[in-house]
């Protein structure tokens, strides 16, 4: 698997990954993203800003995420404390096609994200997720992300995590 910048012509495929993840989250009984966010336009905006990335394998695109190297204003206020005050990257909108899930996919994805961040001289990664997203909590624990507290993002409280390499 590889992590590479998303291309404009891949926006629909990336959005389908988001839709597959939405359906998966609903099947688990929670909503990670509201129906009006993220949209395909959100992905096009990510791509235009150079922060949209795809995970691909021999069959093509299997996942999408947004990686921002630098400040996330929503993370300035936290009910808790971040592990580091060094520069960091933020991962948003991480989603995979249903057919691709399992088999160590998240482990490989986070390894690629860490490598990408290190190549950009950043060794801390932050992200947030819904309280109900137990699958992601498990993945983040396994990947040595530490729960840091609550932030307000996208209209409500989110659990904030940080990996400090």
What spans do the regions from the language model cover?
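A short beta-loop-alpha structural element at the N-terminal edge
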Residues: 2-16
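Conserved GNAT-fold acetyl-CoA-binding loop/helix
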Residues: 22-42
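Conserved beta-hairpin
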Residues: 49-65
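Conserved acyl-donor/pantetheine-binding loop and adjacent beta-alpha core of acyl/acetyltransferases
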Residues: 66-101
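C-terminal "cap" of GNAT-fold acetyltransferases
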Residues: 84-85, 150-165
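Conserved acetyl-CoA-binding loop-helix of GNAT-fold acetyltransferases
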Residues: 96, 102-115, 138-142
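Conserved GNAT acetyl-CoA-binding A-motif
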Residues: 110, 117-129
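Conserved beta-strand-loop-alpha-helix junction that forms the acyl-donor binding cleft
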Residues: 127-137
């Amino acid at each position: 698997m590889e992590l590479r910048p998303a291309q404009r012509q891949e926006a629909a495929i990336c959005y389908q990954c988001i839709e597959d993840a939405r359906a998966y989250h609903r099947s688990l009984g929670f909503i990670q993203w509201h129906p009006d966010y993220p949209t395909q336009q959100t992905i096009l905006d990510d791509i235009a800003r150079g922060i949209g990335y795809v995970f691909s394998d021999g069959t093509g695109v299997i996942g999408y995420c947004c990686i921002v190297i630098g400040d996330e204003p929503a993370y300035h206020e936290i009910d808790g404390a971040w592990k580091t005050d060094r520069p960091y990257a933020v991962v948003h909108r991480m989603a995979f096609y249903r057919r691709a899930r399992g088999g160590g996919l998240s482990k490989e994805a986070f390894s690629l994200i860490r490598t990408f961040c290190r190549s950009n001289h950043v060794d801390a990664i932050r992200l947030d997720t819904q309280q109900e997203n137990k699958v992601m909590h498990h993945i983040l624990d396994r990947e040595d992300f530490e729960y840091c507290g609550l932030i307000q993002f996208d209209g409500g409280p989110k659990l904030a995590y940080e990996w400090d390499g």
